[in-house]
């Protein structure tokens, strides 16, 4: 039955391809998200297995809430790395490299992630009640763009710190990612992070920079949940918990707009306006609840992945069932500590090289956000909002944020939190807010690109 299939117009029901091809397509989607998804736990100290479990479960939950209509995969969000670096910064090992997880503070960071997902849910309900155009006026590109720029700049020092562990591996990883992005074709262009890790890992093997001791002692099967990292058990009303909320929740204000761009990109690829059907309220709700689930279980925030949108465009297989197959495969892999041990052997220098370009790309995507939305910086209003956001984020971050006491509880506002609050307030107060969001044009909106935030 699958011998005479016309791929030119796209395949919307992959069952006609047969079980074997559907499985291969699912594996392809899993590899598309893999490099970026496992990099986040390596940069934050979270469990790779828990991250894969949360990506798989989050994707299935998203598909359930969106009625199985949207062919999107949810993986780890890079945008939240800035929040993790503030709430639970990696600790230095004996050689001075930032490789040790901050186990004391990670649960609070995950709790912040869980509550940030509820922001998506709240905005989803507001959109259902008041309409999408009224709500989106509070989150224009002149606010979200500079916040994304600041996230990348705040992370830059940690990238250099990791590179210093092994500059050779860092340059190989960095160079490979650049070559794949600029000159790569087809799947090579879609998988720059994964290929960068594989090539630099091969160099690490040749130079003897890989330690296999942990692999031999790891079990083949294990439960991918670790109580000590779960955000569920960190919701305790402590100053650490409150400060984590104020630090991480504002990031959701920026990532929501990236979500809109990604859904628009999927719409343009498939030829169906998912912003209208099943509706942005449902896609936001699905993404938000997936993020809340991940945070409660001790995983990073989830986000729709641009890499998988690229796979859709290449393969022309648009059936969401294929994405759900990839989600199930990710869940299966999460139950293997042996697999996690292999991932954890990736040298710090490689992580540094990948994050070198990755963190820069986060800031560059923020620039792209304001450029593609034609933000007019000859307008003093827009210039002031962007300037105050950037200085607030970077300036307060350099001095440890702003600490104050409310009802006997010490609360610390990070630079990102202050920047988001000030940006939204200035946008609401200053005259001249002419931003209009048009869901009918959603399929033409800019996406966040292949290096997903």
Predicted segments — roles?
Residues 1-24, 212-232, 268-275, 283, ...:
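Intrinsically disordered, low-complexity non-transmembrane regions of multi-pass membrane transporters
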Residues 1-74, 78-103:
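N-terminal signal-anchor module of multipass membrane proteins
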Residues 6-7, 34-37, 173-180, 191, ...:
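Juxtamembrane interface elements at the cytosolic ends of transmembrane helices
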Residues 10-20, 42-63, 67-69, 249-320, ...:
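Membrane-embedded helical hairpins/re-entrant loop segments and their flanking transmembrane helices
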Residues 20-35, 169-173, 191-192, 223-262, ...:
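Hydrophobic, membrane-embedded alpha-helices of multi-pass small-molecule transporters
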Residues 46-51, 68-81, 135-144, 189-195, ...:
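Short, non-helical or kinked segments that cap or interrupt transmembrane helices
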Residues 85-91, 181, 308-323, 329-334:
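Interfacial segments of multi-pass membrane proteins
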Residues 105-213, 327-439:
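Membrane-embedded alpha-helical modules
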């Amino acid at each position: 039955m699958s011998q005479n299939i016309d791929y030119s117009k796209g395949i919307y029901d992959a069952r006609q391809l047969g079980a074997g091809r559907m499985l291969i397509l699912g594996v392809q989607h899993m590899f598309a998200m893999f490099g970026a998804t496992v990099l986040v736990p390596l940069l934050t100290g979270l469990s790779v297995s828990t991250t894969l479990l949360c990506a798989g479960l989050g994707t299935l939950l998203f598909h359930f809430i969106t009625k199985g209509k949207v062919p999107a995969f949810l993986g780890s969000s890079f945008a939240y790395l800035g929040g993790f670096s503030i709430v639970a910064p990696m600790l230095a090992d004996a050689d001075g490299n930032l490789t040790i997880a901050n186990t004391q503070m990670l649960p609070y960071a995950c709790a912040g992630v869980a509550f940030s997902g509820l922001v998506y849910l709240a905005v989803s309900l507001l959109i259902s009640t008041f309409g999408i155009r009224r709500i989106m006026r509070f989150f224009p590109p002149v606010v979200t763009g500079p916040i994304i720029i600041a996230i990348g700049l705040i992370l830059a020092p940690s990238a250099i710190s990791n590179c210093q562990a092994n500059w050779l591996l860092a340059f190989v990883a960095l160079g490979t990612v650049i070559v794949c992005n600029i000159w790569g074709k087809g799947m090579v262009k879609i998988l720059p992070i994964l290929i960068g890790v594989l090539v630099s890992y091969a160099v690490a093997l040749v130079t003897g920079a890989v330690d296999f001791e942990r692999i031999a002692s790891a079990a083949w099967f294990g439960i991918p949940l670790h109580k000590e990292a779960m955000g569920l058990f960190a919701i305790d009303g402590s100053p650490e918990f409150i400060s984590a909320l104020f630090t991480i929740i504002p990031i959701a204000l920026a990532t929501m707009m990236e979500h809109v761009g990604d859904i628009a990109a999927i719409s343009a690829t498939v030829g169906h306006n998912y912003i209208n059907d099943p509706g942005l309220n449902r896609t936001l709700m699905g993404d938000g609840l997936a993020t809340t689930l991940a945070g409660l279980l001790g995983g990073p925030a989830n986000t729709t992945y641009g890499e998988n949108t690229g796979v859709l465009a290449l393969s022309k297989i648009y059936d969401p069932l294929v994405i759900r197959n990839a989600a199930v495969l990710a869940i299966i892999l999460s139950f293997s500590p042996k697999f996690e041990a292999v991932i954890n052997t990736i040298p710090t220098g490689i992580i540094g090289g990948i994050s070198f370009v990755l963190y820069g790309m986060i800031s560059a995507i923020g620039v792209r956000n304001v450029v593609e939305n034609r933000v007019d910086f000859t307008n003093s209003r827009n210039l002031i909002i962007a300037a105050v956001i950037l200085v607030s984020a970077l300036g307060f971050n350099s001095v440890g944020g702003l600490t104050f006491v409310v009802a006997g509880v010490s609360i610390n506002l990070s630079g990102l939190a202050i920047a988001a609050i000030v940006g939204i307030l200035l946008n609401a107060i200053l005259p001249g807010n002419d931003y209009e969001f048009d869901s009918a044009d959603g399929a033409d909106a800019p996406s966040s690109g292949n290096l997903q935030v």
